[in-house]
Amino acid sequence: MNNTKKDQYSSQSIKVLEGLSAVRKRPGMYIGSTDQKGLHHMIWEIIDNSVDEMMAGYGTTVKLTLKDNYLVEVEDDGRGIPVDIHEKTNKSTVETVLTILHAGGKFDSDTYSMSGGLHGVGASVVNALSSSFKVWVNRDYKIHYIEFKDGGVPLKPLEIIGTDSKKQGTRIQFVPDFSIMEQFEYDETIIADRIEQLAFLNKGIKFIFNDERTDKKTKQEWLYEGGIKQYVENLNASKEPIIPQIIYGEKKTKVTLPKRNLEVTMLLEVAFQYTNGYYNSTYSFCNNIHTNQGGTHEEGFKNALYKIINRYALEKKFIKETDGKISKEDLSEGLTAIISIKHSEPQYQGQTKDRLGNTEVREFTNSVVSELLERFFLENPEEAAKITAKAVSAMFSRKRSEAALESARKSPFESASLPGKLADCTTKDMEISELYIVEGDSAGGSAKSGRDRFYQAILPLRGKVLNVEKANHEKIFKNEEIRTLITAIGAGVNPEFSLDKIRYNKIIIMTDADVDGAHIRILLLTFFFRHMFPLIEKGHVYIAQPPLYRVSYNKQNKYIYSDAQLEEWKNQNPNVRYELQRYKGLGEMDDVQLWETTMDPEKRTLLKVSINDAANADKTFSLLMGDEVSPRRDFIEKNAKSVKNIDF
């Protein structure tokens, strides 16, 4: 990265807006929640500051270290937070940045032309929510140090504690304040996935993750010189591309927004490739933040594909005027794409930054991608024909499946439209209703008898669930079990899926605790992920946890849910005589047992299905359920030891 910039990063770059007191009162407003997700968000805030420094052209390496007792350390080799006295606070700029909300370089467009933070409050918020917060700044050949306690109270002003002529940058250590935050463990998988994503999105920056916690002791490094091209390559590792090339382009521009009298800088990168799959794997980002609801950058990208491929299809006689247009949905089939824009003045729709709203981005992206794809088609006619043929095939498949789709999208509350095998609940109150998807008629019969009919519905699956990863839309929507699921849930399928129409608040998958049951679970989850993604995204999908064993002793029964729990019980009761029954299937339990162990809200355990990284989940579903055997074997070998529940 270039370290010789004409602009100076000093106290003059730091703008001060307001104090910190609100953060401890309402932490959810600043980091989303106080649970495990909030704990991880605190890490992201500090890492994002370091990445912003790299994006501004200073430094090459960001290192995260987890230590025992919840201590987190983030270090970079950027310029270091300014250490001079700030004119408005009469304190060091380091202390100003870390104790005053909205005081940060992100508010000075000369300092950071593009950054992830909409408000620039990250470091001070983390300080406010930490019991201990320590900062070392290597700058101007000196080592500066300041320490805060109990939500941002400085122990003493910034001091010089040594010299170092070879090193520059910032090192921060913090421990969350568990009088505010809930005490969860840091999840190394979630952290590693996010850091790897940052490495893909910021080519040439090295990321290091050291987990030094007791019993962990791992080190991972990421450096992707190919950036988002390598991201697409990674996502397609278990897929079969129909063209060998990854289409890639980037462009930087400055535009003036007349209504705001403001000049903005935009840097766009796009990389995409078509595969022989049936699903859309498009992921968009603005300033490294995943915009999972899309926005103007995605709209511009799709508009460009729509314009160029439809024009090419007509010119080369792949379709006639009477066939109609290839839709944007058709063009998304088998597409893997990364759209990454860096913007100096991003405008998001909603507090969570999940949709980009800048109107100037739409035209900029459309223009760049149109020019890129048009040139690619001109220079690569064979690949252009394959891409177009894929889109045309998707169009005709869609048209053939429309009748099947229509029958699956009937009004959810018309009893005549509900499948005959569904034992529906009495209530029409979606907020309390539950749908149990049960494996087989035998278990379905016990579930129907044992349920609370008022709010629990039962849908037994008789046939084999289709692996939607390997099927086109026409085949999927002709499958009886799939049609039954769609009709029972009542909300349609992507892209018209509507959460407002779901008939049940909880969709609970209840299968046997064996290999076949696990296979049915993953088939159902694949369908929900590909065709009803908001169900998972908004937390409506659950996995029931039926017992593995029944221990009978002293004229009483105890239900046990794992081998580890069984061993624990044996160790605690070494002299007790008992009988042990292992449940091979749900059908071995009568209705009373099934209610007591698996369906009674007062006693049952449900696992909520959640997704932290949609792109990574996409890759995993493709790997596990796709055609490629070798990557699937590698994945299983790599992850087998970390699986807590597996039945061979």
Swiss-Prot record:
Alphabetical keyword list: ATP-binding, Cytoplasm, DNA-binding, Isomerase, Magnesium, Metal-binding, Nucleotide-binding, Topoisomerase
One of the record's GO cellular component terms: cytoplasm
Stored InterPro entries: DNA_gyrase_B_C (IPR002288), GyrB (IPR011557), HATPase_C_sf (IPR036890), Ribosomal_Su5_D2-typ_SF (IPR020568), Ribsml_uS5_D2-typ_fold_subgr (IPR014721), Topo_IIA (IPR001241), Topo_IIA-like_dom_sf (IPR013760), Topo_IIA_B (IPR000565)
Principal place of residence: cytoplasm
Cofactor: record remark: Binds two Mg(2+) per subunit. The magnesium ions form salt bridges with both the protein and the DNA. Can also accept other divalent metal cations, such as Mn(2+) or Ca(2+).
Superkingdom of this protein's organism: Bacteria
Gene3D superfamilies: 3.30.230.10, 3.40.50.670, Histidine kinase-like ATPase, C-terminal domain (3.30.565.10)
EC number of this enzyme: 5.6.2.2
Catalytic activity of the protein: ATP-dependent breakage, passage and rejoining of double-stranded DNA
Quaternary state and interactors: Heterotetramer, composed of two GyrA and two GyrB chains. In the heterotetramer, GyrA contains the active site tyrosine that forms a transient covalent intermediate with DNA, while GyrB binds cofactors and catalyzes ATP hydrolysis.
Function of the protein: A type II topoisomerase that negatively supercoils closed circular double-stranded (ds) DNA in an ATP-dependent manner to modulate DNA topology and maintain chromosomes in an underwound state. Negative supercoiling favors strand separation, and DNA replication, transcription, recombination and repair, all of which involve strand separation. Also able to catalyze the interconversion of other topological isomers of dsDNA rings, including catenanes and knotted rings. Type II topoisomerases break and join 2 DNA strands simultaneously in an ATP-dependent manner.
Miscellaneous comment as given in the Swiss-Prot or TrEMBL entry: Few gyrases are as efficient as E.coli at forming negative supercoils. Not all organisms have 2 type II topoisomerases; in organisms with a single type II topoisomerase this enzyme also has to decatenate newly replicated chromosomes.
Entries under PANTHER family matching the protein: DNA GYRASE SUBUNIT B, MITOCHONDRIAL, DNA GYRASE/TOPOISOMERASE SUBUNIT B
Protein name from the UniProt record: DNA gyrase subunit B
Organism, scientific name: Mycoplasmoides gallisepticum (strain R(low / passage 15 / clone 2))
